[in-house]
Amino acid sequence: MESSLQKLKFQDIDINLIPTAKWTTKLQYILYTWCQSILHVAMFFSDIYTCIKLLAFNTWSNNIIQPFLEFRISKWLFSGCILCSSLILIWELVIGLRVYRKKEITSNYMNGISRLINCLFNFKKYQIFELIVLTDEKKFSKWLFFSYFEISGCLRLLFGDSPRQIINGLTLWSVLLTVSNETSSGTHSTQSLGNLDDLNGIINKIKHIAKTNYEESVILSFMLFSFIIWVILISKLILSIIIFIIFIRPRFLSSKRKVKGYELKLRKYVSKVIDENLSRTVYELGILIDDEEEGTICGDNKTQKKFDYDSPDYGDESTIPSYYCYSDVETYERVYTPIKAYFPQKYKHKYI
């Protein structure tokens, strides 16, 4: 009789027993959850407005600064990128809402959309997600999380933002270089180019433009800001790919597995690490709910329950409840799995 282990859900945890968060955690919650969400929504509506102006009115949202490429080329390039980004976003929303309805902590943490929805409306769930990462002391797991989440969420960055930001960067450079050459009388153009080789020089040129054309300087400032954000994001993606190739992939594909032609998938490994961290967290904090007696199990001596089992596999007193569904009958059975089943590396028993 085969059985499948059902993962922990939010209703299995008493969120009221989660320790009070520090002010730094609350600040991170505001910045990384609410501020980023508002920024993404504003950028999305800005993209929609630009796309409508391009396709319906055959013009840019501003007529002051023209793109680096010809309008007939940049028009379809920008519109295609915006439409592609919107389609990817809709696809991610559909998958994210499906994951959100499952209420599984691990799958909700691994999906960016469902993780954001949970965090926006419940700070305690944000704390649970943070505890998953903070309780892992292994540097390899931290690099693994960084690499996985950067690579798994790179579609919109590569196909929706990168082509536009490259054109924005070239347009910004050409406008500033033109202004630099016009204002530097009696000097060679390469000397003017040298004034734009760092961020300080670019900002000074934008300040100079503001003296004669304030609206143009504002547009250039927003273009510069979005381009810097894109450079940071694409740098993180490149770093995550390098980390995956050099450090993570060799761990998955050892010499013995190469001979057998077997390779462990990244997503399954990340899910396993999150499950272990989550089990360790709820055990140490004692925040897991026992539905049968309306109390919590594990944790300190006041809430910890001991179970006696005749089987040697259940010799450890620290247990975690699991739910098994048998395929041949529609019945569920609650059993208490020992902690050593979640952390076999701490015990001498070998599990096949």
UniProtKB/Swiss-Prot annotation:
<keyword id="KW-1133">Transmembrane helix</keyword>
<dbReference type="GO" id="GO:0005886">
    <property type="term" value="C:plasma membrane"/>
</dbReference>
<dbReference type="GO" id="GO:0015079">
    <property type="term" value="F:potassium ion transmembrane transporter activity"/>
</dbReference>
<dbReference type="GO" id="GO:0005934">
    <property type="term" value="C:cellular bud tip"/>
</dbReference>
<dbReference type="GO" id="GO:0000324">
    <property type="term" value="C:fungal-type vacuole"/>
</dbReference>
<dbReference type="GO" id="GO:0071805">
    <property type="term" value="P:potassium ion transmembrane transport"/>
</dbReference>
<feature type="topological domain" description="Cytoplasmic">
    <location>
        <begin position="58"/>
        <end position="76"/>
    </location>
</feature>
<feature type="topological domain" description="Extracellular">
    <location>
        <begin position="1"/>
        <end position="36"/>
    </location>
</feature>
<keyword id="KW-0472">Membrane</keyword>
<keyword id="KW-0406">Ion transport</keyword>
<keyword id="KW-1003">Cell membrane</keyword>
<dbReference type="GO" id="GO:0005775">
    <property type="term" value="C:vacuolar lumen"/>
</dbReference>
<keyword id="KW-0813">Transport</keyword>
<comment type="similarity">
    <text>Belongs to the KCH1 low affinity K(+) transporter family.</text>
</comment>
<feature type="transmembrane region" description="Helical">
    <location>
        <begin position="37"/>
        <end position="57"/>
    </location>
</feature>
<protein>
    <recommendedName>
        <fullName>Pheromone-regulated membrane protein 6</fullName>
    </recommendedName>
</protein>
<feature type="topological domain" description="Extracellular">
    <location>
        <begin position="98"/>
        <end position="227"/>
    </location>
</feature>
<keyword id="KW-0812">Transmembrane</keyword>
<comment type="function">
    <text>Low affinity potassium transporter that, with KCH1, participates in high-affinity Ca(2+) influx system (HACS) activation during the response to mating pheromone. Directly promotes K(+) influx and HACS may electrochemically respond to this K(+) influx. KCH1 and PRM6/KCH2 act at the apex of the calcium signaling pathway that is used for survival during prolonged exposures to mating pheromones.</text>
</comment>
<feature type="transmembrane region" description="Helical">
    <location>
        <begin position="228"/>
        <end position="248"/>
    </location>
</feature>
<feature type="topological domain" description="Cytoplasmic">
    <location>
        <begin position="249"/>
        <end position="352"/>
    </location>
</feature>
<keyword id="KW-0926">Vacuole</keyword>
<feature type="transmembrane region" description="Helical">
    <location>
        <begin position="77"/>
        <end position="97"/>
    </location>
</feature>
<dbReference type="InterPro" id="IPR031606">
    <property type="entry name" value="Kch1/2"/>
</dbReference>
<dbReference type="Pfam" id="PF16944">
    <property type="entry name" value="KCH"/>
</dbReference>
<dbReference type="GO" id="GO:0043332">
    <property type="term" value="C:mating projection tip"/>
</dbReference>
